[in-house]
């Protein structure tokens, strides 16, 4: 809590308390050809159609900007808040809010795709590239992802794509709930049907499609592919997944899922009351299971499965309390 004083001709005339507070968010649903209803069924979100594929839970990207839902910044969009109150984010140097947290409901296969790195993305698309990672919230039995490819050179890669030799080219991996995958830029990938994922990524919406299963949109048209750009940016060699590291202390089990130049991502499992102190300029938190409360500056905030919030830089300490709470936490 910070104390502020107002003065008039050298006399103190008023005193007020400015309390630190979390930033809860109203966010944007994205309809997708492969989407479904699990965002409603699993999280209770009000979805506008039966084909909602993505919930951009914490986003300042212009294609889906979150708005603050509480406190003195209520109604302010996250992009404006970041631009006008950089002190809330540790006065970090990134010119735009650098991260995006989304939940994806893959009712059908997503396209086989790849994302560029920052240099290629800025040169060709005018925005950042995309390195991302996936935490599998739920997966139907037998669900798979595509994670990498088998080509040994760019020439072989091009030939396999031109020949549409997908079975030989693409690497399929079975998945289950609580699996984690690190997907750096340049990785061939696709999320399979029946999978619910929390994705942490750079704030970018650039995707190059390699293959889309020859399906058509609502107007009967095939979706655009981006073969030349895909071949430009695809890595050769197997992707290297991260090696999560878990530590247990009292009522907290904390797993570092990945740490790189763009973000660090953790899974917190809480079975009681845990006090925290700030170790990052700001943090993004998503509740995937359970319910409980967040306490900041003596004020309690109820949280439950489906809650998403930011702890800005002025929140020096906080408490999380609940049974069976599971959160994904990230910071730049």
What do these predicted regions represent?
Residues 163-169, 180-182, 188-239:
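An exposed, glycine/acidic-rich loop-and-rim segment of catalytic or binding clefts
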Residues 2-152, 214-240, 265, 326:
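Transition-metal
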Residues 159-167, 291-293:
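Short, structured beta-strand/loop micro-motifs enriched in basic residues and often containing a Trp
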Residues 170-182, 297-314:
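Short acidic-glycine-tyrosine-enriched beta hairpin
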Residues 208-275, 279:
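C-terminal amphipathic alpha-helical segment
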Residues 285:
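Structured binding elements
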Residues 96, 104-109, 118, 128-129, ...:
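Ligand-binding loop in jelly-roll beta-barrel domains
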Residues 273-275, 290-295, 308:
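Short beta-strand segments in beta-sandwich/barrel cores
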């Amino acid at each position: 809590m910070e104390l502020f004083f107002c003065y008039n001709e050298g006399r103190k005339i008023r005193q007020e308390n400015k309390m630190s507070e979390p930033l809860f968010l109203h966010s944007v649903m994205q309809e997708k050809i492969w989407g479904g209803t699990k965002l409603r069924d699993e999280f209770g979100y009000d979805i506008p159609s039966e084909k909602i594929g993505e919930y951009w839970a914490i986003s300042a990207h212009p294609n889906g900007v979150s708005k603050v839902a509480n406190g003195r910044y209520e109604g302010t969009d996250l992009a404006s808040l970041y631009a006008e109150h950089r002190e809330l984010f540790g006065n970090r140097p990134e010119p735009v809010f650098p991260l995006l947290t989304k939940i994806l409901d893959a009712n059908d296969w997503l396209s086989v795709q790849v994302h560029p790195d920052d240099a290629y993305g800025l040169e060709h698309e005018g925005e950042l590239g995309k390195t991302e990672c996936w935490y599998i919230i739920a997966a139907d039995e037998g669900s798979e992802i595509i994670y990498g490819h088998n080509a040994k050179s760019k020439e072989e890669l091009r030939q396999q794509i031109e020949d549409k030799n997908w079975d030989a080219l693409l690497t399929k991996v079975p998945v289950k709930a609580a699996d984690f995958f690190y997907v750096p830029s340049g990785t061939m990938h696709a999320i399979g049907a029946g999978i619910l994922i929390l994705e942490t990524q750079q704030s970018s919406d650039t995707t190059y499609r390699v293959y889309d299963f020859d399906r058509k949109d609502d107007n009967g048209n095939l979706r655009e592919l981006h073969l030349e750009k895909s071949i430009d940016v695809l890595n050769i060699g197997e992707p290297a997944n991260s090696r999560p590291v878990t530590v247990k202390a009292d009522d907290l089990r904390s797993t570092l899922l990945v740490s790189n130049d763009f973000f660090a991502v953790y899974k917190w499992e809480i079975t009681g009351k845990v006090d925290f102190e700030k170790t990052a300029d700001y943090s993004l938190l998503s509740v995937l299971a359970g319910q409980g409360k967040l306490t900041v500056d003596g004020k309690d905030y109820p949280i439950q499965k489906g809650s998403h919030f930011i702890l800005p830089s002025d929140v020096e300490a906080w408490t999380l309390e609940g049974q069976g709470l599971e959160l994904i936490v990230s910071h730049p």
